[in-house]
Design a protein with these regions (language model features):
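Extended, charge-enriched "interface" segments that sit outside catalytic cores
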Residues: 4-139, 144, 417-428, 435-437, ...
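General structural feature for long, well-ordered alpha-helical segments within catalytic domains
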Residues: 13, 21, 54-61, 74, ...
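Glycine-rich phosphate-binding loops that contact phosphosugars or nucleotide phosphates
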Residues: 124-133, 139-306, 504-507
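Short glycine-rich or small-residue beta-strand-to-loop segments that form or flank ligand, phosphate
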Residues: 144-152, 204-210, 330-337, 373-374, ...
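Short, solvent-exposed amphipathic alpha-helical segments in soluble enzyme
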Residues: 161-166, 195-199, 221-223, 255, ...
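Active-site phosphate/pyrophosphate-binding segments
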Residues: 226-411, 450, 497-501, 506-528
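Substrate-recognition/cap regions that form aromatic- and gly/pro-loop-enriched pockets
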Residues: 391-394, 402-461
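C-terminal helical/tail subdomains of lipid-metabolizing enzymes
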Residues: 455-527
């Protein structure tokens, strides 16, 4: 059972890792290593760890740690439906939304894999009706835009995936609807999003598993008022993605409802109905199905016990080594692909909400560090922003690069002897070597110490399958790290206290004087 799993500091392999001498990246990084230190992933991707400060002796100990903690076995139990979310006594079934890898998971007599597949098929049929004009807005106009209303996992993942797939869909001629996303309760966000929409031709997708999310329901009201102001029937322009037990389920205020359940956490929900509706409407079911196929294939590879053949497991263990042996508190995600512009923000939530924990699965304080701080931006933009600190700052920040040989689009020209894609990838290669090897200079201001660890996920082109594999890779990496740290990666109690205090302020029941004072300072109005 997860509750009986040991802490990291109890591991003999971890103790041996702590005793290993420092590895000089400047010596280690050679052309032969760049070619050899690589693990295949799904959809033609590869995980390259040549610029990581580890040698065979490190990998042997990390393999021992994986075996000692039965990391793949814990993953198998999760797939079989064991209640790995020990804090909420729930199963963890996001893998099942893209395919079956273990036995059938039953709940109250229902096959949950079949339930997720049924919801996908309902969504695909609905999207097809919208695309052929069988379902229209209340004015009779065909829907040409879709807007997802949601926050957190109901926004970050689907938004990142939409942006990542948009150029690929255009290349294939299947950008069927444009999408917008409304998340923040800041009224200016709603104003700006609504100003970009033709409301008569817009279908809104309200996403709230509980049906009670404050920010989402507030924005829903703003949308309904805007629709009515234009003489439109708001009920014809909204569908809901929710749980079957929420107040939104089967509600006549929505044109239709599509379902998820409590076993799929918000930040892991992009391959459930949460992502399926908006992506199938925008690009058609085939693109979303390709995304699912890539994710499922990567999930299957994550069952490989040998870390030298399991990129997600190796990436997880290298991250633990960087965090708990070398003591690095941050990690930067740096995609050299503008299509992945919002992918770091999604990974920030995925990682920090999952592994930002300070107690183990028994509720005991952790005697070691857990999840790192995650941030990032696409290259080459980041090079002209925060890379200065990454190269010469006093803190070492490990780096996760992502790059592709080809652009998604076809429009690229030779400029000064090279294409834009050539320039992009030349910058990526240069950064990998610069971070690892540095440069000696008598002028201290121009001296680069190097020794900055980095990994690279590379592929031919960012396709829907590759994006699915990339998504699943990071989800599984984070899962494995949670197992190593003996924490529950599948709850988020840290976000609850702020919600409680917000509710007190808005209801006028706050008793804390400092809370009341901040409310007054920010011009909070007394409850109506």
């Amino acid at each position: 059972m997860p509750q009986s799993c040991p802490n990291l500091n109890e591991s003999r392999h971890y103790a041996d890792l702590l005793s290993l001498p420092f590895t000089d990246l400047r010596r280690l990084l050679t052309a032969a290593r760049v070619s050899a230190a690589e693990v295949p992933m799904a959809a033609g991707l590869h995980y390259n760890y040549a610029a990581m400060p580890v040698e065979e002796r490190h990998l042997d100990l990390l393999q021992g740690l994986s075996d000692e903690f039965d990391l793949v076995g814990q993953y198998q139990r999760l797939l079989a439906g064991e209640r790995m979310n020990v804090g909420e006594n729930r199963r963890v079934l996001h893998h099942l939304t893209r395919g079956q890898l273990g036995p059938a998971v039953m709940h109250d007599g229902r096959d949950l894999g079949a339930f997720y597949r049924e919801q996908h098929q309902r969504i695909f049929a609905f999207a097809e009706q919208v695309h052929r004009g069988a379902l229209r807005g209340s004015s009779g106009a065909a829907f040409t835009q879709v807007c997802q209303i949601g926050i957190g996992g109901s926004d970050l993942g689907p938004r990142a995936l939409y942006l990542a797939l948009q150029q690929e869909a255009r290349r294939q001629g299947c950008q069927l609807m444009t999408a917008e996303f409304l998340s923040n309760v800041d009224p200016d966000d709603a104003d700006q999003v609504l100003a970009r929409l033709d409301l008569a031709r817009t279908l809104f997708v309200l996403v709230s598993k509980s049906g009670t999310t404050q920010e989402t329901l507030t924005n829903e009201t703003l949308v309904r008022v805007a629709l009515r102001h234009q003489g439109l029937d708001d009920r014809a322009h909204l569908v809901a993605v929710t749980s079957e037990t929420s107040p939104l389920a089967g509600n006549s205020a929505y044109r239709d409802s599509f379902y998820m359940d409590d076993f799929v956490g918000g930040r892991f929900s992009s391959t459930s109905a949460v992502g399926a509706v908006v992506l199938s409407l925008a690009f058609g079911p085939a693109i979303f199905q390709a995304l699912l196929a890539g994710a499922h294939a990567q999930d299957a590879l994550a069952l490989q016990p040998d870390i030298r053949h399991n990129a997600s497991l190796l990436d997880a263990l290298l991250g633990v080594y960087l965090r708990n042996v070398l003591g690095y508190p941050c990690s930067a995600v740096l995609p050299y692909s503008q299509a992945l512009s919002r992918f770091p923000a999604h990974l920030q939530q995925l990682d920090m909400e999952s592994n930002g924990k300070s107690v183990n699965r028994r509720g005991e304080p952790l005697p070691y560090a857990s999840g790192p701080i995650i941030f990032g931006e696409p290259g080459t933009n980041g090079q002209h922003s925060f890379y200065q600190l990454l190269h010469q700052g006093t803190d070492v920040v490990p780096l996760q690069f992502i790059g592709f040989e080809q652009a998604q689009g076809q429009r690229d020209l030779l400029v000064q002897g090279s294409t834009s894609q050539d320039k992009l990838n030349a910058n990526l290669a240069a950064q990998l070597v610069a971070f690892a090897k540095g440069r000696a200079d008598e002028n201290a201001n121009r001296h680069f110490a190097g020794q900055r660890p980095a990994s690279l996920i590379r592929g031919a082109r960012l396709t829907a399958e590759a994006l699915g594999a990339l998504l699943a890779h990071f989800e599984n990496k984070i899962m494995f790290q949670g197992f190593v740290w003996n924490i529950n990666s599948f709850d988020q109690e840290g976000v609850q206290l702020g919600k409680v205090l917000t509710g007190q302020l808005l209801a006028g029941t706050a008793e804390d004087e400092a809370l009341q004072a901040y409310g007054r300072l920010l011009g909070l109005r007394p409850p109506a």
